[in-house]
UniProtKB/Swiss-Prot annotation:
Primary role: Catalyzes the isomerization between 2-isopropylmalate and 3-isopropylmalate, via the formation of 2-isopropylmaleate.
GO biological process, one term: L-leucine biosynthetic process
Entry keyword annotation includes 4Fe-4S: no
Name the UniProt record assigns to this protein: 3-isopropylmalate dehydratase small subunit
E.C. designation(s): 4.2.1.33
Keyword Cell cycle: no
Catalytic activity: (2R,3S)-3-isopropylmalate = (2S)-2-isopropylmalate
GO terms under cellular component: 3-isopropylmalate dehydratase complex
Species name: Aliivibrio fischeri (strain ATCC 700601 / ES114) (Vibrio fischeri)
Pathway: Amino-acid biosynthesis; L-leucine biosynthesis; L-leucine from 3-methyl-2-oxobutanoate: step 2/4
One Gene Ontology molecular-function label: 3-isopropylmalate dehydratase activity
Amino acid sequence: MSGFKQHTGLVVPLDTANIDTDAIIPKQFLQKVNRIGFGKHLFHDWRFLDDAGEQPNPEFVMNAPRYQGATVLLARENFGCGSSREHAPWSLADYGIQVMIAPSFADIFYGNSINNQMVPVRLTESEVDEIFQFVEANEGAEVTVDLEAMLVTANNKQYSFEIDEFRRHCLLNGLDNIGLTLQHADKISEYEAKIPSFLK
């Protein structure tokens, strides 16, 4: 995986609190165990008027022409609550979302997002309010997220955010759990060479 340093992208504002993982990716789409192909089912029950996903809901914000191609999702508090399904960040990433900005995220969803190389940015409610106002008032509004400096820039204003150093290291260097393990491949091989043959 390539690391995340900085990203500038179009923002889609999802002005709803407590969005759970069942809304992000409904349970009927959880049959697969790889990460590809879930984007078309993202927010299925909100994006579409039919079960087959062929009739877009014109009232849902992500279907608006001005937000097509958005890579930054702006949301309200407690985003990603509910069950711990990793399919939720898979669907967001497959749709093209690289950054999520909200006042808070559910803990498991927050960790799963980082494992899937998406950056969940926590700002204060008032800061999120300001960005909502900027995005809704300006078609094509973009924000820049700088993970190295831990800054969000929107409407020529900067907002600082915090992320623990270990998770920041993983994102900057494109490391998931497997990548972290492979960093110690030489030590693992050295240990395995010392294991008595009858234990192998």
